[in-house]
Amino acid sequence: MKFPKRIRTYCPRCNTHTEHRVAQYRAGKRRAMALGERRYRRKQEGYGSQRRPEQKRFAKVTKKQVLVITCTVCGRKRPFLGIRLKRLELVDVVR
């Protein structure tokens, strides 16, 4: 699906319709020293079963693509769409 790189939509902080930049959401780095991560690694050591079950078959064919829009006036970022797509392409719109 082709989606424009810039859209005009409502900004809750500016309380008006403004131009927004569109980008694809990317997850941040996982913290290796977080308690859950340390607990998971400790449980995985040695012999025995997996802490979480391995998934044998998958129910979904695609992942949900989340877009993040940034207001060009105030700089506020917010998630925009979570749509199921195989491919997402951000394109410049020629007017």
Swiss-Prot record:
Record the organism.
Answer: Aeropyrum pernix (strain ATCC 700893 / DSM 11879 / JCM 9820 / NBRC 100138 / K1)
**Whom does it interact with, and what assembly results?**
Part of the 50S ribosomal subunit.
The organism's taxonomy opens as:
Archaea, Thermoproteota, Thermoprotei, Desulfurococcales, Desulfurococcaceae
- Cofactor(s) it depends on: Zn(2+)
A single GO CC term for this protein reads: ribosome
Which parts of this protein are zinc fingers (C4-type)?
11-74
Which InterPro entries is this protein grouped with?
A: Ribosomal_eL44, Ribosomal_LSU_eL42, Ribosomal_zn-bd
User: What protein name applies here?
Assistant: Large ribosomal subunit protein eL42
GO annotation terms (biological process): translation
Q: Which domain of life is it from?
A: Archaea
Q: At which positions is Zn(2+) bound?
A: C11, C14, C71, C74
Task: Name the Pfam families on file.
Answer: Ribosomal_L44
In the record, the note on similarity to other proteins reads:
Belongs to the eukaryotic ribosomal protein eL42 family.
Q: Which GO terms describe its molecular function?
A: large ribosomal subunit rRNA binding; structural constituent of ribosome; zinc ion binding
| The entry's keywords | Metal-binding, Ribonucleoprotein, Ribosomal protein, RNA-binding, rRNA-binding, Zinc, Zinc-finger
Q: What does this protein do?
A: Binds to the 23S rRNA.
Could you give the cofactor binding note from the entry? Binds 1 zinc ion per subunit.
